[in-house]
């Protein structure tokens, strides 16, 4: 249920390319890492930008998430700590988002945790999988070594998730990078 790749970007690319059908939607909280919408578009999906404001520390609220989910929603991308804001979802915030996601079994979650070891102040990192283990079959965790260990040129990332998705990602990676 794990695949290693050439950085988190390749793994997000592989996951979306392996799973998105035309017209599938991906919810992306703003501000966002520049590549998310481009990867979604390349995979044939539609990016749904969730306008997250400074008043909520640039994090998606359960209310906004509920408003944006529909039958076409395939993925939610959660980046915590966030790039470019550094915003970190608390355990309570993740719990509240999980409460919404439990009602929408069509929605999978990419937890881009690449900055999990780079946190400032007294904030603590949690990933959705530890807060809501009942959603584990719908969660894809993305992480890597480059950011946490100052190895930016090494491009070593890993993804952990549902076995069928991981197998599809491995198949795609085997045809594109070996």
Model-derived features with residue positions:
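Active-site phosphate-binding strand-loop segment of PLP-dependent enzymes
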Residues: 53-122
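Short beta->alpha connector loops at strand-helix junctions that form conserved
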Residues: 30, 49-53
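Phosphate-binding glycine-rich loop
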Residues: 1-25
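Hydrophobic residues at beta-strand termini and immediately following loops
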Residues: 5, 50, 128, 142
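Conserved PLP-anchoring active-site segment centered on the Schiff-base-forming lysine
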Residues: 18-40
């Amino acid at each position: 249920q794990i695949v290693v790749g050439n950085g988190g970007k390749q793994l997000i690319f592989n996951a979306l390319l392996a799973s998105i059908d035309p017209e599938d939607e991906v919810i992306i909280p703003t501000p966002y890492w520049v590549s998310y919408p481009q990867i979604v578009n390349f995979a044939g999906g539609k990016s749904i930008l969730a306008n997250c404001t400074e008043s909520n520390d640039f994090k998606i609220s359960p209310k906004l998430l509920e408003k944006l989910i529909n039958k076409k929603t395939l993925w939610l991308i959660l980046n915590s700590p966030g790039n470019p804001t550094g915003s970190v979802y608390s355990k309570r915030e993740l719990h509240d988002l999980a409460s919404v996601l439990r009602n929408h079994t069509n929605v999978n979650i990419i937890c881009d945790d690449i900055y999990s070891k780079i946190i400032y102040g007294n904030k603590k990192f949690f990933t959705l999988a530890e807060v809501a283990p009942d959603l584990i079959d719908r969660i894809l965790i993305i992480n890597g070594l480059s950011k946490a260990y100052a190895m930016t040129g090494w491009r070593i990332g890993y993804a952990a998730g549902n076995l069928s998705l991981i197998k599809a990602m491995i198949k795609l990676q085997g045809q594109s990078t070996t």
